[in-house]
Amino acid sequence: MFVRFYKRLDRQYIQSQRRWILSSNKCLLQGNKNATISPLRRAFDDQDHWEESQAQNTSSEQDNKGKNSSYFWSRSKATAPQVAHTGLFQNPYLNSPEGLRKFANKSLTEATALVRNLREDSSQEGLVRYIIRLDQLSDILCRVIDLCEFLRAAHPDEQFVAAAQECHEQMFEIMNILNTDVVLCKRLKQVLSDENISSKLSSEEIRVGHILLEDFEKAGAYASPEVRKQFIQLSQNISIIGQDFINNTESLSSSYIKIPCKDLESSGTSHLVLRQLTKDTMGNNYKIPTSGYAPYTLLNACPSEAIRRQVWTAMFSCSEKQVKRLKSLLQLRRKLANIMGATDYVSYQLEGKMAKSPENVKNFLNTLVDHTKPLAAGELEELAKLKRNVENLSETNTLKLMRPWDRDYYSSLSPNFTRPNHRVDGFTSINTYFSLGVVMQGISDLFRDIYGISLKPVVAQAGETWAPDVRKLQVISETEGIIGLIYCDLLERPGKTTSPSHFTVCCSRQIYPEENDFSTIQVGENPDGSRFQMPVISLICNFRATRHGKNKSLCLLELSDVETLFHEMGHALHSMLGRTQLQNLSGTRCVTDFVELPSILMEHFAKDRRVLLRISSNYATGEPIPEELLSAFQEQNNFLKNTETFSQIKMSMLDQRLHSITDQDDIIAVYHGLEREMEVLVDDQTNWCGRFGHLFGYGASYYSYLMDRAIAAKIWDHLFKKDPFSRSSGEKFKEGVLKWGGSRDAWQCIADALDEPRLVKGDDWAMRFIGEVEDM
């Protein structure tokens, strides 16, 4: 209850800061004297300039201690005292692992004092402000727990990561203790039931109050002391084992496998491929690594199905220890659900969600299966024909014939489905038109067109970021000024999470007159003079930068990378525009099966030809991408599209089943049984479910991704398909969905966006309506 966080994320003190002086506000592109490069693009594409500006900013801070800090490309207002070396996110505590511990202890002291006030202040004014104070308590805890969640995933210093884990466990336990606090729960119920008090509350306060009351009850606040104690311990254990599970999802059962040289050499595999492989010391076997480039090359190039199956199985299998972690996680969750009176964790978790019940989720997924399975089978038929011909097989059932280790090999043989290897005849590589800076500028331009906001780069203070290649962006509204901050950690680096992620570091909320300590937050100002806690988020990706021409390094994106970046920026957009009075409902703090909607809608923009043509720019010439080249790549990107969607359906069903079974010892059998039941590219060879990391973060709610894909497809068709740059459509989506965060019923938001009032009920008809979508 007190902490609601999602990855999927000192006052901004009003001060005059001198602009970093550039020789020109726009700089010439390499190789094209007539083209110009925007400051935002240059921040990501000109590594030398970035390093120079970082160094100059640090030097300026050291030379001007106590004076205004040096930002470049944009001004921001502030009145904070300047220091030569701040901490992460301008929090002065966060300059060392020990500083993080001090910040956690400071927050714990503040939380303890606030809890005492909540328990003791029974005055009329105290009761009227009770929900606001509960929200402030939640904010104190969130700003430690969410921060630590981020640091564990991204900070390069192992000591910082260890401190983050320690502080996370400490504050998470406090949160669970508060979740079961009987006194706090009863007083909240009193506030909501007393009309003399509730009549003085805003609609947002009442909604937060009801949500918090439901969370109290879900945590067992009315249960016996023994049950509450069990809830606290189980929740703590789930958090710890879940983090351990996440940390090991990339660990394979073995780092390599051995294949006899005679088998591989007689398989028909190209000698060019074989020359890239190493042999064991005796020279009798090839040592095939289970990660990296080599195994994928064999899946594409080896004619032997037996060898492909062996390689594929090794690539997607985890250790027995990892399977045990998953079993423990599932057992703990089932026990927690049972002591709370639920039959299983699925039923427990779906309370309060859009889907409402396991039966509704099941019906939704079955609707998708009925629509998608025939389409997936049709896509695989072309590959099945090739397999029949190559191996002289008589099997006519495509789904029985095609296995997951066949897909890449027969795709490489098919003239109709072969993916281009970065090039189309007569053209340069497609990624040369989508440098990281070009795409970031394109996203900013799109946001400006449809939402009236844009992105501006600023140089962070020394110590404000955790790695030298992190870029800091201000989010600027046409009407409100600076509304939020995004820290972009987009380039690959050892030790950081491999999953693209949006981390909320600090939620937006209203600042109250009695608050005067802004040393650990950044504060924004509304047009009416009121102040708000600046939303701060971090975006994590692992794009690769390489040397290109005169550039020290340049990051060029494939179309799939462009979609990834648009997706994560969709989460960021939600965090920036969903600035509610109370942080409990700010931005992405909405129900789980609604949170992916803004990000998946952004994927539609990333796939739209009109958008891509507008934002593209060759990094060397400045020319837009040729439409013929873009069309060719987009056609190839639709390769096995429905088959990929069906794999998401299978994962959603697996999540539901694993969280509803009574015997967790049979999880591999459950996985294999579901694969055989679903029939499409059946995997009955691996224990891949142990590598399915979303079973922790999206436990019993992984269906949310598909549900939001279906909703996003309908919203795209209704609002943006005709004109993706429409300001009126953007305003409708912003006013109907984005600005509310979680402060409005999700079905009401969707009903308004789609102009379909019947959806407000969120009943069986609504679920079927969402599930009946032609193109996800």
Swiss-Prot record:
Catalytic activity: Release of an N-terminal octapeptide as second stage of processing of some proteins imported into the mitochondrion
Family label: Belongs to the peptidase M3 family.
SUPFAM superfamilies according to UniProt: Metalloproteases ('zincins'), catalytic domain (SSF55486)
UniProt key word Protease: yes
One Gene Ontology term, aspect cellular component: mitochondrial matrix
Organism: Eremothecium gossypii (strain ATCC 10895 / CBS 109.51 / FGSC 9923 / NRRL Y-1056) (Yeast)
CDD domains: M3A_MIP (cd06457)
Compartments it resides in: Mitochondrion matrix
Protein name, per record: Mitochondrial intermediate peptidase
